[in-house]
């Protein structure tokens, strides 16, 4: 089957690789000059299935009000003048109940765990290198309230059989030796030994090369203008004056997926702006060995070979790509507070990206009401974590195979409404 994939971020490239491995003739189209040059370029570098959780959580609405008055707040909201933003935030608020949080987190952990398994199999098969580490993830708590609040996440981890360790301040140095110097600032930590890290942009670039060796064609610097429709199906992709035709089409355009298919269906994928800095390591003993999550500031600090990546925060501000100095100050403050002297933040590069987020946190992967149109978008802050599993799942669906995990509640159908305004039963 001929398949066209729109988008060459980590999700689009992973989709291309698994489809090519399944025997399909694949073409990837992107407006950029190469793979992973937008949202996948400088993310936090974590592959953290156990920490796959929606931003829509109990207590977040009240926290959001408090964060409005804090300098280093992890969440910021500025109205972008669109009705869509207001609708999206309303849907997100509706998902901030304990019941919906548990359902949404369960879906996310299921896909993320499967995705890590797919990544490990890919690594074993190909030997792909991307400055990866398998040292686990450590969530750090600065208050007793945060430590007590971890109970709901631990319950989900136990239900999903995800290994974890609850650490006292004195035990944190066993996972991250450099934290010994700042353990007095912390009340404990939750460690997931099965989590991994790696440079997402490097991984995507090398996976694209592997995909090319399987026959995938990459068309960069190519405008993606519109989908041509005929007879209720997609008849091609309009790229400037050219129409590219295939048997099946995959939209993996991140935050831009919403507007691109708006004439066909409405999907609630909104850009959630995040930031990162990448600093050179100057003192190995003071640097992290894997990755930590600062629960207070919602910031991840990740070790690459000779660099530290510090990323996080969320701004609901539309398609604004402005680099804000105050956000850099927060990232530098966090890493220098936990790992003083480990990296030289004065020489750090500063980046921002738009994560494609759904109100419930779960991505949209699978079939659509248009028979030859498939979606792979809405992964939010977890595109790197979920990329391989999403690509394999999509390849199975397009190939007519039964996916290895439950996929019916991951598709767009959970958001589509029937004439009575009720959500239709979800199916893949």
From Swiss-Prot:
Q: Which cofactors go with this protein? A: FAD
* Gene behind this protein: dadA
Could you list the residue ranges forming a coiled coil in this record?
none
Task: State its Enzyme Commission number(s).
Answer: 1.4.99.-
Q: What is the lineage of its organism?
A: Bacteria, Pseudomonadati, Pseudomonadota, Betaproteobacteria, Burkholderiales
Protein name in the entry: D-amino acid dehydrogenase
Q: Does the keyword Ribonucleoprotein apply?
A: no
| Family matches, as Pfam families | DAO
What job does the chain carry out?
A: Oxidative deamination of D-amino acids.
Q: Look up the record and give one Gene Ontology term from the biological process aspect.
A: D-alanine catabolic process
One molecular function GO term is: D-amino-acid dehydrogenase activity
Instruction: Give the matching InterPro entries.
Output: DadA, FAD-dep_OxRdtase, FAD/NAD-bd_sf
Its UniProt pathway annotation is: Amino-acid degradation; D-alanine degradation; NH(3) and pyruvate from D-alanine: step 1/1
Q: Please give the organism.
A: Burkholderia lata (strain ATCC 17760 / DSM 23089 / LMG 22485 / NCIMB 9086 / R18194 / 383)
Q: Name one GO cellular component term.
A: cytoplasm
> Which family does this protein fall into?
Belongs to the DadA oxidoreductase family.
Q: According to its UniProt record, which reaction does this protein catalyse?
A: a D-alpha-amino acid + A + H2O = a 2-oxocarboxylate + AH2 + NH4(+)
